[in-house]
A protein has these predicted regions:
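Sec-dependent N-terminal signal peptides
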Residues: 7-9
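Negatively charged
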Residues: 18-295
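N-terminal signal peptide c-region/cleavage motif recognized by signal peptidases
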Residues: 14-16
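Positively charged n-region of N-terminal signal peptides that target proteins for export
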Residues: 1-4
């Protein structure tokens, strides 16, 4: 390993006792050591050269240790562990510059590391991030996802996930499609979310087994697509009468086979609705609780 040693000799002519200062610079470490007192070197947060995404994937596929890989300049992590096991500790990775997390752990069925400390503040795409990650259940509620514009299918099929994420700032997101589809264990509060930018909500809670949380505070004023949003839900039965559905176009099968739902939503504004076939077929909804246009 290459080293450069700079020795400075303080001369007595300057009224300073003789002392030696050593600066040691290696490929992976930098340390300033006063009087060369034998202090140990302090590592940076990674070891080696900065990697590109392609180089990181090659390292992962090689089976070598990537726990301290230098990924600080990678902005796109989409799919890097898709369908793969994560065999080394990545909890210390610096993700501060990553914008795209799409499918990062999709179908990584054994992944369950605590990545709650990751810096997600640059993230804009969280789509499919944990899709099919059937073991993942870590406390990521403190993530800063405030720049996220899509959460499509983020937890689809993540059957173990059941962590509070109600403090997330999702106010910039336009797409929530399939976000919790078949996330059968998920049952956490979401009523505080600001979804006012959301346009796409299709299949968001489809086939959720346990989810039954209030959503009546949601600002749905920009929602256009809500097909299958609560289809085949088994527990959901919460009031939604406060929703502003004036821009809603596609309501097809929204409550299809929603076997528990029977709330009065007859006041919904359906003036923009163009698709609403099978709106409540197979559900527990009483026709009197259905918007007149959809009966």
């Amino acid at each position: 390993m290459k080293k450069t040693i700079l020795s400075l000799l303080a001369l007595s002519a300057f009224g300073i006792s003789q002392a030696q200062y050593v600066v040691v610079i290696t490929e992976n470490y930098v340390i300033a050591n006063a009087e060369n007192n034998g202090d140990t070197e302090q590592p940076k947060n990674c070891v080696g050269e900065e990697l590109s995404k392609a180089e990181l994937i090659a390292l992962i596929d090689s089976g070598q240790d990537y726990s301290q890989a230098c990924i600080n300049t990678i902005t796109n992590m989409s799919g890097v562990f898709s369908g793969k096991s994560v065999d080394y500790d990545i909890t210390g990775w610096d993700t501060a510059h990553v914008q795209y997390f799409g499918g990062m752990f999709s179908d990584s069925t054994s992944f369950n590391q605590d990545i709650s400390g990751w810096d997600m503040s640059s993230g804009i795409d969280f789509s499919y991030m944990f899709k099919g990650a059937t073991s993942f259940n870590q406390p990521i509620g403190l993530w800063n996802v405030g720049n996220g514009i899509t959460f499509k299918a983020m937890f689809q099929g993540a059957t173990a996930f059941n962590q509070p994420i109600d403090t997330w700032n999702v106010s910039k997101s336009k797409n929530f499609q399939n976000m919790f589809t078949s996330a059968t264990a998920f049952n956490q509060p979401l009523n505080s979310w600001n979804v006012s930018s959301g346009e796409e909500f299709s299949q968001m809670f489809q086939n959720t087994r346990d989810f039954n949380q209030p959503l009546n505070n949601w600002d749905m004023s920009n929602a256009k697509f809500m097909s299958y949003m609560f289809a085949t839900t088994q527990s959901f039965n919460q009031p939604l009468n406060n929703w502003n559905t004036a821009k809603g176009f596609n309501f097809s099968s929204m409550f299809y086979n929603a076997t528990a739902f029977n709330q009065n939503i007859s006041n919904w504004d359906t003036s923009s609705a163009g698709m609403y076939n099978s709106f409540y077929v197979g559900s527990a909804l009483n026709s009197a609780n259905v918007p007149a246009k959809f009966r």
